[in-house]
Amino acid sequence: MYKRQALDGVLELAPYESCVVVLEASGAIEPADCTDTSTRATLALDISHPWTVALSPAGSDRTFGEPQKLERLCDLTAEQFPGVCGTFRYRTSFELADDLAHTVIDLGDVYEVATLTLDGQTLGTRICPPYRFATGALTAGAHELAIDVINTLDHATSDIFALTEPVAPSGVLGPVTLLGQNLPK
């Protein structure tokens, strides 16, 4: 997320999260945005409901197979796609009743690399937690969400370590949530 803002000297980061802070060369400090957000409720919308998921096997030309319906988020290599590696494409839609400001989509637990697309716009790629994507303001109405998750080759290849070490899960385990603030009416 790129935004200009004044800092109060405290920077809170989630585990594995990083942030680049750029200071003005002049040393000038701009006043903070003093908008009162205390009257705006923070909204958390669970979007872990039914998804479709399709697989593009590793080494393919990124052609995805027929989408399968998922009633719940789970380890895909333990259930729907055992013993495979590649890219899993998740799709779902959700509806917002009101306009929201400062929204973030949090994918919860993901294994391994996730790229998020909202309403046709790619919002970025994450390689480790937190799997959070700033979406900016969202308008009321229907929204389309797609997540491409790439797992690792250890799901398709057996080796001596696989006998004693468990293989990590694959895919989005969730919960997937949309966090935001209601805009004042």
Cite the ranges covered by each PLM segment.
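Short, small-residue-biased leader/transition segments that mark boundaries at the very start
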Residues: 1-2
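Exposed beta-strand face motif in extracellular beta-rich ectodomains
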Residues: 19, 103, 141-143
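Short, flexible loop/turn segments at beta-strand junctions in immunoglobulin-like
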Residues: 10-13, 135-139
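Short, isolated positions in well-ordered beta-strands
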Residues: 7, 60, 123-124
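Short strand-edge motifs at loop-to-beta-strand transitions and within beta-strands
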Residues: 7-9, 19, 88-92, 129-133
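An acidic-aromatic loop/edge-strand motif
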Residues: 28-88, 138-185
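Aromatic-lined ligand-binding clefts that engage carbohydrates, nucleic acids, or primary amines
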Residues: 94-96, 100-119, 126-127, 145-149
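C-terminal beta-strand-rich structural cap/linker in extracellular carbohydrate-active enzymes
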Residues: 9-31
